[in-house]
Amino acid sequence: MTKKIILKKGREKSLLRRHPWIFSGAIERVEGEPLPGETVQVTAANGDFLGWAGFSPASQIMGRVWSFDINERIDADFFKKRIAAAWALREKLSLTAPEGGCRLIFSEADQLPGVIVDRFGKFLILQLLSAPAEFNSSSRPPCILLRCSSG
């Protein structure tokens, strides 16, 4: 059984305009007991498909849409394609010089809700700001984090 978020009648309008957030007040019910961060199908009250979203039960934004395409699979290849598209845009904007710094992935702007990657020279800083982003973090490369709190 596919896990689902079913919206209240008339609450699909923002999704039809491609807004990626699903607020808790727009949800009629959740079916299938999805885990925090798990990808669910989002449907209108009449059953029409609206998108694939990461589920965040502890947030006011209970769904963050990964894709509005019914045929898209949300897997490692999905994330690779979205990351490659974000990189290609930064290259087009001449933001990829090795000594520079920029925001390589900017969450919803790059169709990766809750994921931010900043680059400062040879260092990358990854922020996972939602349950769906954390749930799918097994797709990220291994890294070493050195944190110094002493100033």
Predicted regions and their residues:
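RNA-binding accessory domains that recognize and position tRNA/RNA substrates
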Residues: 1-151
